[in-house]
Amino acid sequence: MALLPFPLPFAELEVGHHLYWQIGDLYLHGQVFLSSWILIGILLVLVLAGTRNMQRDPLGLQNLLEFLWNFIRDIARDNIGEKYYRDWLPFIGTLFLFIFISNWGGALIPWKIIELPEGELGAPTADINTTVAMALLVSLAYFYAGLSRKGLRFFELYVEPTPIMLPFKIIEEFTKPLSLSFRLFGNILADELAVGVLVYLVPLLVPLPVMLLGLFTSAIQALIFATLTAFYIGEGLHEAH
């Protein structure tokens, strides 16, 4: 998500100064790389701590992890179906957990204490390159699911119920990743900017309601992304009616 052969035009949408590392002909977005791995590390620690001494009657962190597992399982099963959802549960669960912890980490972790030569750390999902990369992964998963299940018959859905739908179906394939990526990016970036401005202007209790609303919105965005991912995969797997 952070490794690019050249700086993408999407990077122009970012706000402020940014840190890039050049490795040969590749450009590595330093802020996204660092914040992503910090958050992945936190997630791994939480998972290992919650599954270290598992009990028959779950308590504490184990209970929370089992709740999340059941929640993600229900999303996958409802949208993909009983027959195929298990194959896609790790993919959908990984996306949901990464987006969720990225969104909340961007709001709760005091990133400013980590000083960088340029820019500052923040939520990886507030960077357009991250959200576009995840949206493209979802598109690839959709095509893989359809082609692996139906072969070339997968492309019949582009001319159903009538061939006149072909151009509209093609346009739809481009709008899916665009809507996924820009919805997540726009909401998280707007939340970070709003909180940042309020903290700068009124640094006491006024920003707190906005931060709480931002946490709620961040959780909803993770849910929307995971649900749409499962829906698209289910759409690719099932026969058109």
From Swiss-Prot:
User: Which InterPro entries does the record associate with it?
Assistant: ATP_syn_F0_a_bact/chloroplast, ATP_synth_F0_asu, ATP_synth_F0_asu_AS, F0_ATP_A_sf
Ordered alphabetically, the record's keywords are: ATP synthesis, CF(0), Hydrogen ion transport, Ion transport, Membrane, Thylakoid, Transmembrane, Transmembrane helix, Transport
The record's listing under Pfam families reads: ATP-synt_A
Keyword set includes Aminoacyl-tRNA synthetase? no
Tree of life domain: Bacteria
Q: What is the recorded membrane topology of this protein? A: Multi-pass membrane protein
Q: Which GO terms describe its cellular component?
A: plasma membrane-derived thylakoid membrane; proton-transporting ATP synthase complex
- Whether Amino-acid biosynthesis counts among this entry's keywords is no
Q: Name one GO molecular function term.
A: proton-transporting ATP synthase activity, rotational mechanism
Q: Where are the transmembrane segments?
A: 30-50, 89-109, 128-148, 193-213, 214-234
Q: Give its localization.
A: Cellular thylakoid membrane
Q: Report quaternary structure and partners.
A: F-type ATPases have 2 components, CF(1) - the catalytic core - and CF(0) - the membrane proton channel. CF(1) has five subunits: alpha(3), beta(3), gamma(1), delta(1), epsilon(1). CF(0) has four main subunits: a, b, b' and c.
Cross-referenced NCBIfam families: ATP_synt_6_or_A
Q: What protein family is recorded? A: Belongs to the ATPase A chain family.
Known function: Key component of the proton channel; it plays a direct role in the translocation of protons across the membrane.
What is the name attached to this protein's record? ATP synthase subunit a
Q: Tell me the organism.
A: Parasynechococcus marenigrum (strain WH8102)
